[in-house]
Amino acid sequence: TALAAVPAEKAVPVKQAAVVTEAPVVQPDLGPRRSVAFIGSECYPFVKTGGLGDVMYALPKALAKLNLDVKVILPRYKCIPQKFQEKMEYRGSFYMNLCSDGKQYYVGIMEYQEDGVVYDFIDNDEFFSWGNPYTNLIDDIPKFCYFAKASLAALNYLDWTPDVVHCHDWQAA
């Protein structure tokens, strides 16, 4: 069918649509990028015996998504699955004293990155070559004293000074 022409006197004027311009979104000035170091004895998927492993996995990932500079420091246990061990990269090593007896202890640093999070593993066969992260208090106390001190020394060695150092549980404190 053909459309009939409408006489000009009966035509309804069409209003032009208003042009809407959106105000530009102004991002708040958040200042410099913040950095957080998480130090703990376990973290999924590398090693997990309880809830600490879940927290050490989820919290750093969530903060990395918010654009924080995040680093997780863990012991390099021999029980960490090989698929992670073979992807770790050597970052360096040094020696430190643990107490006033003058004995120097090796501190190796191996790095693994995933989902915007840097995982630095403290390597020392004397303390971390056992099958389980936790053995008994007689062995665990010196092992985790070493780990806590080596973790802080590793931050210095890597020349990275975080805004926050979050130590999880007694093993890192």
Give the label of every model feature segment.
Residues T1-A173:
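Catalytic cores of nucleotide-sugar-dependent glycosyltransferases that transfer UDP/GDP/TDP-activated
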